[in-house]
């Protein structure tokens, strides 16, 4: 993307269309295209984020921009009048502090979306191993969710999110 600007070139093709354009990225590169983004009639830009802990981010998303760069991108885009949203994904049980993320992004987002951590195939073994090594205090909780299919954590979280959105 940095070298070839594929997204920018696609956006240039769409700018005069009536297409609804929604961009979701972990990257902060779209800040460079604020002028182009402002030309769209129906556009929103989302940033994906699941932690404020940059060490955890480095473990889970080693090639992605830092947490601060993503937060800065949201602020710059929103300040420029571009509709923005936050995609908290994936939510790592017991580790993703949704309330802290929402406090940090308040005033810079127009909406928020959520997605839970889904573990399939080799990712399940890899993540459970990571949790056992780095966050052993949460391993039983992860095993309950991802081995025993216990949905209590997600049910409680969903109720909390609904309560937050109502208040």
Predicted regions and their residues:
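Conserved AdoMet/S-adenosylmethionine-binding subsite of the radical SAM
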Residues: 1-154
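Rossmann-like AdoMet/SAM-dependent catalytic core
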Residues: 157-159
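Charge-patterned, long linear interaction tracts outside catalytic cores
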Residues: 162-167
